[in-house]
């Protein structure tokens, strides 16, 4: 039995900002924290090698005070939409129907802080 990848597709979330645009939001989010901790977090954001960050939530919502459950509910709702769009793109690219698929591989990060897929 041979295994092969027939098609690969992706779907970016609707919101994006440059790292430079995100840094002030991170600083505001961390206000009141230890100054050394804030510098470390900002350094991580700045040196991550990520020029543009995509999110299922607008940056104001990402850094708003919400519970784990609220962010996770958003993650569950929104990642399904992204997955469905990405799957349809892959099916179209392959010229297949959903019933032709044997296996799907996904990569995901749960909604602990910043929900992403």
Model features per residue range: what roles?
Residues 51, 55, 108-117:
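Conserved catalytic cysteine-centered active-site region
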